Amino acid sequence: GEIRCAKVYKDVTTRSFKQAVQYQEGRKVRNTRSARAMERGSKFGKQQQEHTWHTAEVDALGLLANTEVRVPETHGLFDGVLLMELITDADGYVAPRLADISMTSEEAIINHVTIIDFVKKMLCIGMVHGDLSEFNVLVDANGPVIIDLPQAVDASANNHAQEMLVRDVRNINNYCGQFAPELLNNRSAHEMWALYGQSQLYEDTPLIGIHPEDTHQADVGAVVSEIQSVLAEEAKRQQRLNESED
């Protein structure tokens, strides 16, 4: 028979309340009774809160199954246990986490490009992982697979979405950067968020990993003109120095 993976969720009482509130901001609860109970924090409300936490991952995985983002296939949620496809390596053993493998510089760059591309494709459908790191990425024979999505947030409805996106990308930068230091200063999160805010982010949008530190949109033309002006001035200065030496 086919071997599958069973994910058993932690009890709601072991989860940080502050974190739960941040992640659940913007999530819609159709049942008004459940929504009121969750706001009051009653026993029933906590049960409903836990249920929405579980179903959020199923919903996120379902949405991503229709994209090019590699995630495990789901096989149902039963009493707080999520059955999923078991991700394996080339030899059929459980695939290691990104955190558990050593990489050459080239391998680190390839994995980084793939993961950032997944992050971009998630943002294209309005989703931010919210807790992405080397511990939530498996690596099978075909490359990275994204896992652990109960906290995934709606990019347009959650006020913390940009902060979470930046943190997600920074975590991947920091880990892959141990093997390829040039990745440490990658600014893809800021770049893709700016494009997303302008409705100009698409699945095939190329990212260069560079973006201004501030949150305002830079006038690229003006910046280029200023750089060219400085270079021209420096060239003239060098020419004057050469002429005076002659």
Locations of regions flagged by a protein language model:
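Conserved ATP-binding subdomain of kinase catalytic cores across diverse folds
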Residues: 1-94, 124
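Regulatory N- and C-terminal appendages and interdomain linkers associated
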Residues: 106, 114, 121, 145, ...
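Active-site Asp-x-Gly
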Residues: 10, 16-33, 94-96, 106-110, ...
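A glycine-rich phosphate-binding loop feature that marks nucleotide/adenosyl-phosphate handling sites
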Residues: 80-82, 136-139, 189-197
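Catalytic-loop of the protein kinase fold
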Residues: 124-134, 139
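Conserved protein kinase catalytic/activation segment
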Residues: 136-148
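An alpha-helical support segment within catalytic cores of ATP-dependent transferases
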Residues: 92, 100-124
